[in-house]
Design a protein with these regions (language model features):
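Hydrophobic N-terminal alpha-helices or hydrophobic patches in metabolic proteins across all domains
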Residues: 1-306
Length: 306
């Protein structure tokens, strides 16, 4: 290997990134990356795209919460924590490898894996430094719980009426009967799988992650964020249902490419991304209001008053 590297031109060798040394910190980070990768691979193979992307966002949030501590990270576990962490992590890796689609354990395994990694890094009394990352990963089982707590029937009816409302604003004639949006040439029925409960739960969980990673100090701002999070998720999905109703009314019903795009996971993923993007803009605007002005701005304001 060394002889092979010696034949590489110096100009090309300079562009090859150096391999980090095998320090305890780097080995722990490598192990963390391997655990996250295996978990996301399990989500990708057993869950739909929406949940897989959400899991990736959760892991990203956990990493952001840990980012400020990376420079001072120095793994030094005690023997009880080392044994417990190794046992837990071995079980998590083995359990993740046999996950099936209906297995709810997949939502809990990331949290258990993070606890194991914390035990492999710090003494038991010191794992509090990973609190925010653990709370981020707690959003995965919380997401599953929220999806089950939100009632399907009333939400489907509300989704249908709001979809009809959007169509009415745009000038399209429609009638809403219970869960069905009817138009002159067809209509759609809002079933539990399409009522947007996943988008609502997702945006709520993203709100919690944002609050952990970039906390808002103002109580009013926090109230606004957590009040609008489910509204943004619901509104995004009702627009998607309205588009589906338009597709059916224009002869692009079930089986057509246009209907399949907006009905199946790809179109749902697009609107899920839109809801997270809109929420992110709202959150960052509120966060900017709490940040102190830049020194240059302060200087300009002082000069103006003079």
């Amino acid at each position: 290997m060394i002889q092979l590297l010696s034949h590489i031109p110096p100009s090309l060798k300079a562009k090859i990134p150096a391999i980090p040394p095998a320090t305890p910190r780097n080995l722990w980070l490598l192990l963390t990356a391997a655990v996250a990768t295996q978990n996301l691979a399990a989500f990708q193979s057993s869950q739909d795209e929406n949940i897989t992307v959400f899991a990736a966002l959760i892991w990203g949030g956990a990493l952001i919460c840990l980012e400020d501590q990376l420079e001072t990270l120095d793994p030094h576990p005690q023997w009880p924590g080392l044994i417990a962490g190794t046992t837990l992590l071995s079980w998590v890796i083995a359990r993740t490898s046999i996950i099936l689609h209906w297995d709810g354990m997949i939502f809990i395994l990331p949290l258990i894996g993070c606890i194991a990694l914390a035990l492999l890094c710090e003494p038991i009394k010191g794992i509090g430094r990973f609190r925010d990352s653990l709370l981020c990963l707690l959003m995965l089982p919380a997401f599953n719980v929220v999806m089950k707590l939100i009632p399907d029937g009333p939400l489907s009816v509300l989704t249908a009426h709001l979809s009809g409302f959007w169509l009415g604003i745009l000038g399209f004639e429609n009638i809403v009967r219970n869960k069905t949006v009817l138009m002159p040439n067809g209509g759609v029925e809002v079933l539990p799988a399409c009522n947007g409960v996943d988008m609502i739960a997702q945006v709520i969980c993203i709100a919690v992650i944002f609050q952990l990673a970039f906390p808002l100090r103002s109580f009013l701002s926090r109230v606004i964020v957590f009040s609008l999070a489910p509204v943004i998720g619901l509104a995004s999905n009702t627009i998607r249902i309205a588009i589906l109703a338009l597709c059916v009314a224009n002869g692009n019903g079930k089986g057509s490419g246009l209907f399949s795009f907006f009905h199946d996971s790809i179109g749902s993923l697009v609107f899920s991304g839109i809801s997270v993007f809109v929420f992110g803009i709202l959150y960052m605007r509120l966060l900017e209001r709490e940040l102190p002005p830049l020194p240059a701005v302060l200087h300009d304001q002082t000069s103006h008053h003079e």
